[in-house]
């Protein structure tokens, strides 16, 4: 039934993918070396932002009175508006759904989605069928946003709305952090196939690949009626587990979130099935201009209140839909549930043995009562063995249920914010959680300029090569993802499982480097009597800087790469192995690495994706690739793309030789994805290269940048630009010094 309702609600926001789709930047699915898309490297949000160039959210936030904002939010909850009346006289459940669906797009596979940048305001998310009528929720918040202006972001306000609502209805949160910054346009996340692709494809069902975090088209998580709209309880359990694990949630957290969330509010399917198609207008991105960004206009009855049309399911779960309790679990276990249909024709369940105390008040008519409902997905929490364990536990221990929901809600709404150092505001909980990728606070004095000079000399004297130092530092820092601010050099997790065992990090070689750096660290720390210490994380980065500086010196250039100490070393206990494995890259074009799962023709686009994750622009990506090739730091000492007669020296040889027309490039007949550079006159092999290397001479935009670095007179510029880009990568994740 949901498919019919979704069609009526408008397919403009619906997204679908076959089970073979790749959850990555949407451009990777059709990219070839000839058609590499550089748009992920263009920071259009800054260009499109209406804010002043010097606007800083952290500074603007200092003008905010959080307590007054919270009071205004609390007052709003019970100020029902005629144009969209509040169910039960309280917008709290509506705002909980708003926050949940905003944060619930997060996916752990690539860090995309989530609440951090307020993407729910833009297409396609604002028009997803699962987000039906949330445009009204955001509109209800507008007077508050208008009042406080740029002192609070939309993305913070949307999440705060749900959190304040919980507290107002008796569920005390464990805290809330401000610090989310707004985007100004829809991003390029691949959520699945577009409606046009759906109609033209031979996709046989609406199931999404696991990496998409949802399981069916246009939904945040799963179809509440059951898989593909069929009331299959066991199948629903499987899809729930898939969807929530894709967000990084455990079974316990999943049960807490669903059972806790369905303690509040109601679902809407009041329009008769035969009236849905004609009554419901298009989603916001296809709505008539006079509707001013509001979609899903409902011409049935009053169009709101008791005539509201949402998911198509109709009813409430408990008799107290605006108060926290564990009645959802009580009803789940003590009522006998029978399959039925909502007025809109959606599969749902009602009890055959409901007592007067179980009856649910009508959301708008005083004195009218209804039977409670359950979704197919709700019943899965009882019938599935893994979920049943926790529903029973929570049913028998209401206080534990309350505590676990509070923790799961905080995780849901803060997971994509990155480390705790990005949090601002007065309500940050003191407790640290492993999903925050915590690093310990430094309980020692940081190294001085003199100490840094001594450590650099110790590194030079250690016997480690420039290549060893550079690659180790790169492998450590380049785990960063700008999407959810995870990874980076802070924590030195390259010395811990799982990173130390990743293929791309060449574990045997890595172990040698880390052992020597740890020796330097121990000797230095033992020699200091004033409380000064250096972390392994700082030494890894400093070692990389030393390697680059020495390589530049060998080429005749004197540079000093900035070094900002303050990184600390995480412990294995602070590191979630399963979660960190999602940071493992399939390919890293900066070191010509691939695990074999990415086809050769997709490697250039994968490089762009990697550069985007590192928050690089086109020139930065270009100069880093050229420099890394000259430095001879490819994975497994591969010579592909090392287009220089002075390997290990930091110079612009890569670009000079790539653009030299005395070389003719041909595909290798021995190795897929390898190209042979042959002298036009001699006919002899000069070089080998990968598609990643050759894209800088093939793609017109990249070639234009490459030519700048190959020009006579720009040799020093190349070295300087490489050093700046290198430093930028080494500083990724250092939010402790970037606010």
Curated annotation (Swiss-Prot):
Formation of the three residue Trp-Tyr-Met cross-link is important for the catalase, but not the peroxidase activity of the enzyme. Heme b binds at residue 262. Binds 1 heme b (iron(II)-protoporphyrin IX) group per dimer. CDD domains: catalase_peroxidase_1, catalase_peroxidase_2. GO terms for biological process: cellular response to hydrogen peroxide; hydrogen peroxide catabolic process. InterPro entries: Catalase_peroxidase, Haem_peroxidase, Haem_peroxidase_sf, Peroxidases_AS, Peroxidases_heam-ligand_BS. Its EC number is 1.11.1.21. Keywords: Heme, Hydrogen peroxide, Iron, Metal-binding, Oxidoreductase, Peroxidase, Signal. It comes from the Bacteria. Its cofactor is heme b. Bifunctional enzyme with both catalase and broad-spectrum peroxidase activity. This is Catalase-peroxidase. The lineage of its organism: Bacteria, Pseudomonadati, Pseudomonadota, Gammaproteobacteria, Thiotrichales.
